[in-house]
Amino acid sequence: MALSPSSDAILSIRSSCDRCRSQKLKCIVIETPSGTACCQRCARAMVPCIFGRRSRSKRTTTTTTTTTTDSGRKQRRREPAAALNVLDSCAAPELAASSSSTNAHFPRGINGGMGIPEDRENQETGTFPFYAGCYGGSAPVTSAVEVIQGRKDPDRNLFRYAFQEESTIGDLGLFTHDMSLFGQTLDDASLANTEVMPPSLTESDGISSPGESAPFRVHLPLSEPGVAARVLLSFASDLHERLETLQNGPWQQEESSMGLDGYPIGSVLHLSLTLTDLGVALQKARSNDDASVSASSHKMDDGQTERVNPNSTQAGGISTSTTTEPPCYDTSVSLMLLSCYVTLLRVCTVVLGNFQTYLHLQPRARPKASPASIYPSSASCLGDLLPINQPHHRIHAAVCLLLDSLEQVEEALSLPYQVRCASAVQASSDPGSCTPSEAKPFSDAPAGAAGRDSATTLIHWGFQTSAAGMQDASSELRQKVEGVKEMLRQQMGL
């Protein structure tokens, strides 16, 4: 084999580098600023220029040394070349040179070492990083596979939740996207945007990562066993992560002087909207399931099966049926909905507590408006006047939004009127509305409300089994709302 090619020399296909020889091209060798030889094509492509016709993994390279004996005869002796010391992908390959004749057979690589790869697969998978020596640099730019493919290695995390770590719902960046959380990996038929699912499910279930929010499909089999439970468990996990984030945040510390302009109120409202849409979607799935079961039961003989009566309740209001299809709204789903609602109450309580902490740190003096803000110009109108204390107005708006979102959740879950916390707080602030004590008991409600379906009955049963925890969460939230509103009245001079 020829010696190292001189600068600006055109090599034959046999003596060209591995990359050019695989494409049946002739190398045009140039001299780099570092003094090494490099092919023009490899230099432009920013890939290692490797000269060597044989793969070390398939055939051992041997060298031939010629010695002259005393009798004048030349003896040829074949010696195996030194083994190639291949380091990991973070370091350049190094060779232990066995003889000077071996180094003369192959041109030196870009990095100054021998350019013989261990095998062709290592060259294609980026074992040897590209060094910027041909452009005057010395630090590695990137690996060859990244240069060829034009991108980094794919993310191997199944969830990509950056909520979850960027994959957990604790990340605030998630809430800057669309509010719906289902991906577009299902069929092409689209659904209503008002129905969303939590983001923590894997793509194996046909659900995309949480970072990519999109409307989910209404034909998702929520009535199948286990689907609704997995969705609610995922959402419950996101609720607890958000609760932990708010509890450990800087706003929880009384000595902190941090303002509330960057408070993540949108994440809490997003959770309320998600739970509302989940309740609506599950009720629709339940009604569709009841309609299909009722239609099939009418076609069957009365001696083989009993007709399904959704208004008939036995053993505490739980409807019974002899059909083989299990109801979508079973006891576990109802209790998980109840658990999500209670956790959402705790999240809202923490938010209101942070508002209270901030208001405690504010001065008690009544704010006074400057003359410039009172009389901006002679043609000013009432709508042109700026609020005296904008942070207090923002807090009041946030409290109203939280109560409205909780009221929507309670309506979507069809909760009994006695345990609707947000509705009770709203009614107490409105003298003309009905108070919680005037609401009819759940068992005495009209037939349309009492016998909607077994889902409402099961939720009510879940409330009865966990009444103590519900009362604590509801009373704490009510106290926080009243405390924040009272402090706002004092600070704003109302």
From Swiss-Prot:
Record field: compositional bias (Polar residues): 306-323
Ranges of the DNA-binding region feature: 17-49
Keywords: DNA-binding, Metal-binding, Nucleus, Transcription, Transcription regulation, Zinc
Source species, domain of life: Eukaryota
Amino acid composition bias (Low complexity), ranges on this chain: 60-69
Localization per record: Nucleus
One term under GO cellular component: nucleus
Keyword DNA-binding: yes
Main location class: nucleus
Annotated spans, Disordered: 57-79, 287-323, 429-449
Molecular function, one GO term: zinc ion binding
Functional description taken from the UniProt entry: Transcription factor that regulates the expression of the gene cluster that mediates the biosynthesis of pyrrolocin.
Protein's recorded name: Pyrrolocin cluster transcription factor fsdR
Organism field: Fungal sp. (strain NRRL 50135)
Gene name, Swiss-Prot/TrEMBL: prlF
